[in-house]
């Protein structure tokens, strides 16, 4: 369990919460449409609600790391709202969609900061992770209770993922955190080769194809 997969689990869980919330608002809007139909006896087009619009187009305000968000100060015209609005305005409206959303962002960002500042310092990460586990497991939000249990279960692998190692890339040696990404990438190449070849009956032939496809120095 490395840094990427920990964050992937958390972002996926929050995203599922937002998608379910969007379904609830869509169901509410459909109920309103049906009420209008039963009252007036004809179909009536209802514009997409503010809540569904924000959840469809601006989930990234919660899912993206805050340090990566680009806020534009100059208001831009929004055709749905029919007025000028900037990123801060969208953020304010998005956070007001549900009482949990601001808490989710604060709790997520706390782990993001922990993950960033301890790169290359596994001893410090080991000291801080216990506090996070306790905080998340004591949370009133089920998503973060589960997240705390995940951190507890994979505590040692997560701490080890803060170790920095030298890697060889196209531009030479660079420093990077321990990750199972490289081996997953290699496994994916094997699967792609098998899929493109529609299977192989001869292992030696497949092995040679794989070694040739993953060679570092091209043959001219």
Where are these regions (language model features)?
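Inter-helix linker motif
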Residues: 1-12
